Amino acid sequence: MANCAIVGINWGDEGKGRMVDYLTGQYDVVVRYQGGGNAGHTVINDRGKFALHLLPSGVFRPGVMNILGNGVALDCENLVTEMETIRSAGVGISPENLLVSHRASLLLPWHRELDALEEARLKDKMYGSTKQGIAPFYSDKYQKKTIQAGELLYPAHLKAHLQDLLERKNLILQRVYGAKGYTMEELIAWLETYAAQVRPYVADTGRWLRQAQAAGKSIMFEGQLGALRDLDYGIYPYTTSSNTIAAYAPIGAGLPTAKIDQVVGVVKAYSSCVGEGPFTCEWFGADADKLREAGAEYGAKTGRPRRVGPIDLVATRYGVEVQGATNIALTKLDILSYMDEVPVCAAYEIDGRITREFPFPAVLEKAKPVMEYRPGWCCDISAVRTWEDMPQAARDYVEYVEQAIGCHIGYVSVGAERESLIVR
């Protein structure tokens, strides 16, 4: 069976959760391969509206195995809370449909505290962190200063390892930031409250995935955030601290030999962004407020108002290229229905020169948008269910974007519900 990756093409918040929720009926396994509790995937179904920060979006589909891979920042506190929320809606969560890689590293209480302390230290130079501990976590992971989930199964080893980490981390907290630090008793209490509830789900998911692959099962890799937030290929340093691109999915999932047959890139019909950094086509004032309200553009995790503007075709084409997208899902087309004409950022002007190539981050700060305008359709399209019934101006807009980014748009969403998706 074919494997698929669902990834963001832009800054994140493109609507990946609804696409995973829609497509999971075709797959046996859904794997999260990077990131932690710092971003949310919104899913709307007959049970309600859910913002999933760690759980794979396949949890709502009976018979689908959901896996948190070794590349994930395993935030036990957020995960336990999320599982309780899902269960309260009548969704079963057990090791029969959720597994956690024994090689996933734990995001510990001090990671979140260090994140907030560093943002406070940076003041007006902050990166716009969600303060969920992601950067300190990945920093520790690459310094080999974390606890792996598999260690939860070996309490004596875990306690000794934690004691070593505690001494070093308290030196940083106390001497660099002037913070209080932690005691061993506090950490043990945290482990007993949260990590103990995750322990039953810990397994050798790499072996499980290899067996699933050998048995011909189909696997979906669910990405978090978008290409422009990738640590290596994004707008550095205003990125996340992991690799969000599809090429990393097999590694972070725990199945490095996997072949990805299809990469579905998710693109919003306009631009939105949470956090700091260059955002070339940003709107301000009344125009921004109207688009933000129309699209309900507030962070799923933080609730922060998102920065918004017209679709950025330069950034989107770059995202398509680095993600290796083979198909595009264009979301929230219905939000643009109030516009008489739809603006698009077709190119950048940098130092008096026009370019359609996405520049190096230091140069991006100088970019100015070169705008074009497409006819609006000025009618509600949220009830449209076939491409043929779409207003001609809306179809023209989709085809214009498709040609500009160089990738087929196979899905167009006109609402948040499962059925509000048009397949081309």
Task: Locate each region found by the language model.
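Non-transmembrane, aqueous-exposed alpha-helical and coiled segments at domain scale
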Residues: 1-424
